[in-house]
């Protein structure tokens, strides 16, 4: 199994089935999705941190965290899975460095 470190961030709420999902809940939901994949094991998760945004316009602060995974997925397979989680949680890619419901990045792989 490979080790992978994932960066997580969110500064937008999303409306899911009539319920508002706040940024902290977005991260928890993404961590749940990561732990459910049969080829991925969630090893540990950092604390959550509130950080100011870098980018265009007025944006809310981000909630950020990092997670350590063990995975049998290749880097490309892992990236595809992370992007599918982002899409499931309402991520729309419009403005570079803009506000987002969820941002998942591979920080380090093996």
Regions found by a protein language model. Name each.
Residues 1-110:
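Core catalytic alpha/beta fold that binds nucleotide/phospho-ligands
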């Amino acid at each position: 199994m490979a080790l992978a470190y994932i960066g997580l961030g969110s500064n937008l709420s999303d409306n899911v089935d009539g319920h508002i999902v706040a940024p902290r809940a977005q991260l928890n939901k993404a961590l749940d999705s990561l732990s459910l994949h049969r080829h991925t094991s969630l090893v540990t998760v950092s604390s959550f941190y509130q950080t100011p945004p870098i980018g265009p316009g007025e944006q809310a602060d981000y909630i950020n965290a990092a997670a350590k995974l063990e995975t049998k997925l290749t880097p490309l397979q892992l990236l595809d899975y992370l992007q599918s989680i982002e899409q499931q949680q309402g991520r729309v890619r419009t403005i570079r460095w803009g506000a987002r419901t969820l941002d998942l990045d591979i920080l380090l792989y093996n």
